[in-house]
């Protein structure tokens, strides 16, 4: 299945980060504005945020019959029962220092996904992946939405999937082109299997990834037949250049 994706991915990403050319006819006027000479990177992600994606994320939450966590009391109850588990920093994973320790939690299968991705990423690039956000309460989401009009709502059919604890935001800002491509390939493969629903958010430059509980079952098959989703596509794309 991985080889079937190689051709599409190699072509789709060829111009993803093309740069705007500087118009030579405007050099004189630009000399009065020192910052204007900086070339801007075109935003062309593989996983664009969309209304349909939010619907799919909420459909998964409804399928699992998970609650949207209302407040800190409900959050602490889910921690106590083990329905939410802690995300812990390690050699392969770091956590954004501003993330409230009380919200460094997620569903067990989501943590498995984060740990698996962080390990293969570390094996490839010898660097850590960073978690910027995990579980949120409705109260927190409403506060976030007041500050950021692009944030998902706290209620309704397109509510943020962070409210169910099945979603994490992973740092995208500061990654190299190859690092971004590696993560995109990894997510593309898992999305094709119906295991994740990813988005690349421009405002916060992060990978927003909702993880299905089906990831647990798929993960067990990888224990028997080890395979990292990004390996073959990433190698094939690099050798074709």
Model-derived segments and their meaning:
Residues 119-126, 140, 149, 188, ...:
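Sec-exported extracytoplasmic/periplasmic mature domains
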Residues 7-113, 201-204, 210-237:
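Extracytoplasmic cell-surface/polysaccharide-interacting catalytic and binding patches
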Residues 106-113, 117, 140, 179-186:
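Stable alpha-helical elements in mature extracytoplasmic
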Residues 19-25, 152-241:
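Catalytic cores and adjacent binding grooves of peptidoglycan-active enzymes
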Residues 139-155:
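Charged, often glycine-rich, active-site loop that binds/positions anionic groups
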Residues 101-102, 115-120, 155-156:
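Short secondary-structure capping micro-motifs at structural edges
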Residues 127-144:
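Acidic helix-start/capping segments at beta-turn-to-alpha-helix junctions
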């Amino acid at each position: 299945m991985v080889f079937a994706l190689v051709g599409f991915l190699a072509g789709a990403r060829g111009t993803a980060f093309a740069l705007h050319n500087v118009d030579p006819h405007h050099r004189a006027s630009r000399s009065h504005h020192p910052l204007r000479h900086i070339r801007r990177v075109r935003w062309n992600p593989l996983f664009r945020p969309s209304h349909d994606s939010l619907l799919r994320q909420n459909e998964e939450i409804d399928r699992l019959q998970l609650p949207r966590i209302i407040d800190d009391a409900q959050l602490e109850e889910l921690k106590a029962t083990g329905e939410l588990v802690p995300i812990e920093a390690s050699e392969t994973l770091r956590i954004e220092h501003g993330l409230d320790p009380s919200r460094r939690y997620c569903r067990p299968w989501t943590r498995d996904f984060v740990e698996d991705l962080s390990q293969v990423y570390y094996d490839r690039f010898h660097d850590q992946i960073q978690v910027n956000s995990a579980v949120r309460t409705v109260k927190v989401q409403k506060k976030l939405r007041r500050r950021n009009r692009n944030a998902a709502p706290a209620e309704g059919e397109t509510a943020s999937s962070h409210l169910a604890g099945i979603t994490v935001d992973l740092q995208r800002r500061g990654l190299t082109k190859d690092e971004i491509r590696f993560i995109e390939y990894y997510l593309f493969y898992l999305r094709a299997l119906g295991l994740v629903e990813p988005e690349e958010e421009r405002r916060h430059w992060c990978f927003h990834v909702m993880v299905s509980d089906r990831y647990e079952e798929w993960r067990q098959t990888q224990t028997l037949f080890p395979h990292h989703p990004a390996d073959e596509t990433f190698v094939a794309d690099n050798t074709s250049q």
